[in-house]
Amino acid sequence: MANVSMRDMLQAGVHFGHQARYWNPKMKPFIFGTRNRVHIINLEQTVPMFNTALKFLSGAAANKGKVLFVGTKRAASEAVKESAIASDQYYVNHRWLGGMLTNWKTVRQSIKRLKDLEIQSQDGTFEKLTKKETLMLNREMEKLEKSLGGIKNMGGLPDALFVIDADHEHIAIREANNLGIPVVAIVDTNSNPDGVDFIVPGNDDAIRAVSLYTNAVATAITEGRENTLVAQAEKDDFVEAE
């Protein structure tokens, strides 16, 4: 089982929160103290809380659940995309478009448009158009790919959200709450933990910390899926033996 240790978190700087003056009092239970006017997060709480979240995500994946990684700020964007792809899941790593979950019907139409454009760009349709028309369609396709590329093959709403920075992604969290989709989120000392089902108190700005979270989640998801495949294979063997 994918587990993250106290040492891993210390080395990645997970314990460094935001400046004390920007804190959210709701994060008080997870704060160890203050050093140089910066809040220090209590990793003795973060370690078990993160490992519980990993267990949940692994279980969701084992039940063939879809996990949507959300991290649209610069420090998270690349790590979110890489880890989602590595674990064969889905991601939003640019702007969160309002209604991405709660207005899925409209989003699905945009995804269909993106897929149609992708087919047209490859089957020779674009070659029959004028340069200006081709340029406009390519621009439209790039714009749609940037917004929806990470969810175009999701095929419906996700079963769980994994979020980097609860404050920055509050709209995504609110939409998930409205639909009853469980949320795992990295929550820094300046953020509001309300609406997060699995709170992981930790630094949400340091690239090393973000990579630690996303890699651990990708590993947990992959292990969950592999365990299901192994169990299914053993079940099939057992049936054959009978």
From Swiss-Prot:
Annotated Gene Ontology cellular components are: cytosolic small ribosomal subunit
* Alphabetized UniProt keyword annotations: Ribonucleoprotein, Ribosomal protein
For this protein, the record's Gene3D superfamilies field holds:
Glucose-6-phosphate isomerase like protein, domain 1, Helix hairpin bin
One GO BP annotation is:
translation
Query: Which InterPro entries does this entry report, sorted A to Z?
Result: Ribosomal_uS2, Ribosomal_uS2_bac/mit/plastid, Ribosomal_uS2_CS, Ribosomal_uS2_flav_dom_sf
Record's keyword annotation contains Ribosomal protein: yes
Reply yes or no: does the keyword Ribosomal protein apply.
yes
Per its UniProt record, what Pfam families does this chain match?
Ribosomal_S2
The GO molecular function terms of this record are: structural constituent of ribosome
Q: Which family, according to UniProt?
A: Belongs to the universal ribosomal protein uS2 family.
NCBIfam families assigned:
rpsB_bact
Q: Which PANTHER family match?
A: 30S RIBOSOMAL PROTEIN S2 PROKARYOTIC AND ORGANELLAR (PTHR12534), SMALL RIBOSOMAL SUBUNIT PROTEIN US2M (PTHR12534:SF0)
Record protein name field: Small ribosomal subunit protein uS2
Organism, by scientific name, is Pseudoalteromonas translucida (strain TAC 125)
What taxonomic lineage is listed for the species of origin?
Bacteria, Pseudomonadati, Pseudomonadota, Gammaproteobacteria, Alteromonadales
